Amino acid sequence: MTHDNKLQVEAIKRGTVIDHIPAQVGFKLLTLFKLTETDQRITIGLNLPSGEMGRKDLIKIENTFLTEEQVNQLSLYAPQATVNRIDNYDVVGKSRPSLPDRIDNVLVCPNSNCISHAEPVSSSFAVKKRTDDIALKCKYCEKEFSHYVVLAN
């Protein structure tokens, strides 16, 4: 029996590959991080086989590179993600997200009375690591939430 080891998602010449995204999280990342607001080609692999994770999602964005801040903001959704910088089809840089002190312009406050819902302000949350959870504190209403509550919002 032979194995066909072809790439399931086409290689890119230059850009960013976000690998090892938990299955079912890829689309959420595209939306939250506004990754689709570009005219560059984006390739998405959903529920791909993974030796480590069983199944995983993958995002490839041509001619686009994530900032360190963007990479670190991925840590809430995909703490095991690997962000690869590609040039001329080769991996020229590799990074993993680490939990930032603050997450701006990405999340929505779950408090329906928060002023961030009525005013044209950018969301901003302080990140506080707990023993068994990560808490996020809204800059505007100053309420603290488990990151699971904010992510589900």
From Swiss-Prot:
Superkingdom classification of source: Bacteria
UniProt GO cellular component terms: aspartate carbamoyltransferase complex
Cofactor: Zn(2+)
Any Gene Ontology biological process: pyrimidine nucleotide biosynthetic process
Amino acids binding Zn(2+): C109, C114, C138, C141
Gene Ontology terms for molecular function: metal ion binding
Cofactor note (record): Binds 1 zinc ion per subunit.
Entries under InterPro entries matching the protein: Asp_carbamoyltransf_reg_N, Asp_carbamoylTrfase_reg, Asp_carbamoyltrfase_reg_C, Asp_carbatrfase_reg_C_sf, Asp_carbatrfase_reg_N_sf
Entries under Pfam families matching the protein: PyrI (PF01948), PyrI_C (PF02748)
Keyword match Metal-binding: yes
SUPFAM superfamilies: Aspartate carbamoyltransferase, Regulatory-chain, C-terminal domain (SSF57825), Aspartate carbamoyltransferase, Regulatory-chain, N-terminal domain (SSF54893)
Family of this protein: Belongs to the PyrI family.
Function: Involved in allosteric regulation of aspartate carbamoyltransferase.
Subunit-level organization: Contains catalytic and regulatory chains.
PANTHER family named among the record's database cross-references: ASPARTATE CARBAMOYLTRANSFERASE REGULATORY CHAIN
Protein name per its UniProtKB record: Aspartate carbamoyltransferase regulatory chain
Record organism: Citrobacter koseri (strain ATCC BAA-895 / CDC 4225-83 / SGSC4696)
